[in-house]
A protein has these predicted regions:
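Cytosolic regulatory regions of ion transport systems
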Residues: 1-197
Length: 197
């Protein structure tokens, strides 16, 4: 049994679709996305499995629902068939990939934005058909790298130029490497992948 299901025997909340956007997971990643979308006037339907976390969010006026967002019946109740966007922000690599596969297979016109736990996970999600993938620590790492360059004596403009160029090259290489990545082969044993890294 997944660890999060053992936390509570509470039944799933009944869901009345609140918008054309479903956010699966409302932790430190999904919560920021939901706040940003809400501040721009977008109604969302949020599904999370942390009962205590959701009760706290309700006190701040967020529309949240308890349940396992990877369950097809719960997604259907949330209105996935009419949704414009599914944001997958849960913190479980295997569950994210599973949900991406299900959503894109069942709803091929749905835009899926998926959280990637690490670089290898980006490739798994790419292989599953997702094309809008966000590495959870990527942007903060770029900012930290820029700060490190400044701490080493580069002026802010030079540090920004280096960080921007690194990001441009890294983003350009991602689809190329994703197409060479093999789920059944460790990256260091995949000669075509290694040749491009």
């Amino acid at each position: 049994m997944p660890h999060y299901l053992a936390r509570s025997t509470r039944p799933d909340d009944p869901i009345e679709p609140g918008g054309k956007i479903i956010i699966a997971g409302h932790g430190r990643f999904g919560g920021i996305i939901n706040r940003m979308l809400s501040s721009a006037g977008h109604a969302t339907t949020v599904i999370d499995y942390s009962s205590e976390h959701l009760e706290a969010l309700r006190t701040f006026g967020f529309q949240v629902h308890f349940g396992d967002a990877t369950r097809p019946d719960l997604l259907q109740a949330a209105g996935i068939a009419e949704a414009r966007l599914l944001v997958i922000a849960i913190n479980d690599k295997a569950k994210i990939t599973e949900l991406v596969r299900y959503a894109l297979h069942t709803y091929p016109d749905l835009h899926v934005l998926a959280r990637a736990i690490d670089r290898d996970h980006v490739y798994e999600l790419w292989a599953a058909g997702c094309r809008d993938i966000v590495r959870e620590t990527y942007d903060s790492s770029i900012r930290a790298g820029r700060s490190a360059l400044q701490a080493l004596g580069l002026n802010p403009r030079q540090a920004t130029r280096i960080a921007d160029e690194f990001e441009r090259l890294d983003r350009a290489s991602m689809p190329v490497l994703a197409n060479l990545y093999r789920l059944d082969t460790p990256p260091h044993l995949n000669a075509p992948y290694v040749a491009k890294v």
